C-alpha cells in the first residue's frame, strides 16, 4: 500500500479547475497538491514549471526524516519546498480554503517562508480520520509491520498461545508508535 500523489490539471489553470478535477475522485490512498511550482533545471541552467508531484515525494521523505510518517507532511516546519523558486500562483486565504474544502492541498507562498505545502488531505470525500495523509500513512506503516512480523503465524493453530505470540510482537511496536505521538 502507498499514498499516490496525483498531478492536478495542467499548468496554467485556475482554482476552479483544480477543485473540479479533485471532486471527481474519492480515495484515501491518494492526494492532490496545487498549483505547479518553478524549480531549477541544473543540467540546462534554466528554470522549469513542474507539477507538484516532482517535489511532494521529497516532502514526505523529509517529514519522515525529521518526524514520522504519522506527522503531517505539511506546514512551515515540515512542508517547505526548498527546491521551489516560486508557486505558479500566489494563493489567497479564500483560494486555500476553496482548495482544501475540495481535498486539494494548497501550495502556498508566505513572506519570508518560501513555498510551502499547506494541506494534508487525501481525496476521500467522507469526513473521517482517513481524509488525512498522515493517518493513511500511519495505517500503511502499521499494516506493513504487522504483515511482515506475523507472517510465520499464519498457519499456526488459533490458540491462546498463538494469539499471545502475536501480541508479544505487535504491542511493543504499537507502544513505540504511541510514544512517538502516532496513537493516543
Indicate where each model-derived feature is located.
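Structured, hydrophobic secondary-structure cores that serve as assembly/anchoring elements
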Residues: 1-184
Amino acid at each position: 500500500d502507498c499514498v499516490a500523489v496525483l498531478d492536478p490539471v495542467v499548468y496554467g489553470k485556475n482554482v476552479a479547475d483544480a477543485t473540479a478535477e479533485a471532486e471527481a475522485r474519492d480515495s484515501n490512498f491518494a492526494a492532490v497538491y496545487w498549483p505547479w511550482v518553478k524549480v531549477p533545471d541544473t543540467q540546462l541552467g534554466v528554470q522549469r514549471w513542474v507539477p507538484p508531484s516532482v517535489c511532494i515525494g521529497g516532502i514526505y521523505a523529509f517529514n519522515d526524516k525529521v518526524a514520522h510518517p504519522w506527522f503531517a507532511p505539511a506546514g512551515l516546519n515540515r512542508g517547505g519546498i526548498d527546491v521551489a523558486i516560486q508557486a505558479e500562483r500566489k494563493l489567497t486565504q479564500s483560494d486555500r480554503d476553496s482548495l482544501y474544502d475540495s481535498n486539494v492541498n494548497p501550495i502556498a507562498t508566505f513572506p519570508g517562508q518560501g513555498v510551502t505545502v499547506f494541506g494534508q488531505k487525501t481525496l476521500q470525500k467522507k469526513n473521517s480520520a482517513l481524509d488525512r495523509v498522515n493517518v493513511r500513512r500511519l495505517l500503511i506503516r502499521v499494516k506493513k509491520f504487522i504483515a511482515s512480523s506475523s507472517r510465520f503465524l499464519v498457519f499456526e493453530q488459533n490458540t491462546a498461545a498463538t494469539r499471545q505470540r502475536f501480541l508479544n510482537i505487535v504491542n511493543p511496536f504499537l507502544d513505540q508508535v504511541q510514544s512517538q505521538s502516532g496513537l493516543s
